[in-house]
Design a protein with these regions (language model features):
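Short aromatic-glycine-enriched beta-strand elements
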Residues: 18-24
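A generic structural motif
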Residues: 15, 43, 74-77
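Short nucleic-acid-contacting surface segments enriched for D/E, G, S/T with interspersed K/R
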Residues: 43-57
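Beta-strand/loop nucleic-acid-binding surfaces
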Residues: 31-46
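Structural detector for short beta-strands of small beta-barrel domains
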Residues: 3-17
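OB-fold/S1-family single-stranded nucleic acid-binding modules
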Residues: 61-78
């Protein structure tokens, strides 16, 4: 993880067949570029999937190409 900071966002899109998706989020009230995530970074039991407009919490890590990605993604309960 880049740092221990956690962020909240909303799933914009997730393709279970493709194995990745994007989260809409903001930092300090400023909208950021949608954050990429890989299904392996979803924290849950059973089948790892997310749905459009689900609220999530996540950290930020770096992928193998040195680009930021969401990690430790957890669905927020209502």
């Amino acid at each position: 993880m880049v740092d221990n900071e956690k962020f909240e966002g909303v799933v914009v899109w997730f393709g279970p067949k493709e194995g990745y998706g994007f989260i809409s989020w903001s930092k300090n009230g400023v909208q950021q570029k949608d954050m990429f995530f890989h299904y392996s970074d979803i924290v849950c039991e059973g089948f790892k999937t997310l749905f459009k407009e689900q609220k999530v919490s996540f950290g930020i890590g770096v992928n193998k190409h040195g680009k930021p990605k969401a990690i430790e993604i957890v669905v927020l309960k209502h």
